[in-house]
Amino acid sequence: NMKFKEYEWVAGLYKCFDEGIVNCRDHAVRLMQKILKKEKNIIPVRNIEITVDRETGVITMMNDGNGVDVAKHPENDLWIPEMIFGHLRTSTNYKKDEKKIVGGKNGFGFKLVLIYSKWGEIETVDHIRGKRYTQRFENNLTDILKPNVRKSKSKPFTKVSWLPDYERFGMKGLTEDMFNLFKKRTYDIGVVTDKSVKVKFNGRAVPNKNFEQYMDIYIGPKTETKRVFEIPHDRWEIGACLSPLDEFTQVSYVNGINTCKGGKHV
């Protein structure tokens, strides 16, 4: 069960974690869309694995499925993975008039994670070109080390690891409250990602329930708390009940993002 409690959190650190895990979920959605369009050489995401080291504070996120294109960009001669992860405004998620089903941040997202990290590492396998790419970023993204590119016959995946700059966040290290928030956020992703994708946190599978069942974690079973639940659209699921806290509360997600402050959708 999910328990309501007061906790101390650092919004910037939480957002860095959120950016990484939403990227994993976004990748699963995009590849599914490509498969529906019958594009070739698409391997779907089947696993998302999140690891948070409680001692060192290092965070690692991995998803399988198509990796990043391991090739040099024709215009600026930079490796595409370095552009995506290490240079601002280099994604393709810019069209404001386009209906969005992903939670990307218009080219800023993971670069900001690295700016607030002592170091970060990326690794990806491009099964189409048969290449594995690894690269390290240090000192809050001021130092971009030379990538290692080699041949590979492995299945595709992308993995990112980073050590947040806890001092910049006014912290001595990873706290118990932040660790638990990261764990809870991983559970969220498990329920807003397609059921064909297995989600793990520190090696253990998280419950990949439907949204109605996920409500039980917050408010208890139907026999305990009466509620109404509807799916008016294939991209909308809504549940409501009397608040157990005797005041208005809400839990909501939009394109995988936890909208903890609500919004027009609420």
Regions inferred by a protein language model and the residue ranges of each:
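GHKL/Bergerat-fold ATPase module in large chromosome/replication-associated machines
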Residues: 197-266
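Conserved short strand/loop->alpha-helix "switch" segment adjacent to the catalytic nucleotide/phosphoryl-transfer site
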Residues: 1-17
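Active-site phosphate-binding and catalytic loops of NTP-dependent enzymes
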Residues: 2-6, 24-49, 91-102, 123, ...
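Conserved beta-strand-loop-beta-strand hairpin that lines the nucleotide-binding pocket
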Residues: 25-92
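GHKL-type ATPase core
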Residues: 55-77, 94-219
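Flexible hinge/switch segments at interdomain interfaces of large molecular machines
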Residues: 1-2, 54-55, 151-161, 238-254
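Conserved polar catalytic motif of the HATPase_c/GHKL fold
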Residues: 19, 23
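Short, conserved non-catalytic motifs in the polymerase core
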Residues: 1-6, 97-105, 249-260
